[in-house]
């Protein structure tokens, strides 16, 4: 999978503090901010106590990359360790999976639709 070109998207930072304009992701029970609204493309993640996310992914920052359509599953298989299996984080928009690769937490983002439609405000919702 070394030939796959990854496009940097954001850095995710775990936090316990409520952030402005958070969006709730039910599948992982985490509040996230939109990294496109941050000058350094930072995403803050605030986990609910009952979140199924544990370990490295919950405790350490992650780097997120957009991956070409059709490559997510192969990238997951090639990783040192799968931290969170792929799922549709936003229906018909983006599928994501988390891995540990070379000691780092990595999020792979495979867009199926418009990347600008990830967050409610970008879809015209509140």
Q: Regions from the language model: what does each represent?
A:
Residues 1-52, 78-126:
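Vicinal oxygen chelate
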């Amino acid at each position: 999978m070394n030939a796959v070109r990854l496009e940097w998207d954001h850095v995710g930072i775990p936090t316990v503090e409520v952030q402005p304009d958070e969006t709730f992701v039910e599948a992982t029970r985490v509040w996230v901010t939109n990294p496109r609204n941050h000058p350094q493309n930072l995403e803050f993640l605030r986990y609910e106590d009952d979140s199924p996310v544990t370990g490295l992914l919950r405790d350490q920052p992650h780097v997120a990359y957009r991956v070409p359509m059709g490559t997510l599953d192969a990238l997951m298989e090639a990783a040192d360790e799968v931290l969170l299996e792929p799922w549709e984080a936003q229906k018909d928009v983006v599928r994501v999976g988390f891995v540990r690769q070379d000691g780092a937490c990595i999020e792979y983002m495979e867009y199926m639709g418009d990347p600008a439609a990830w967050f409610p405000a970008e879809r015209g919702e509140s």
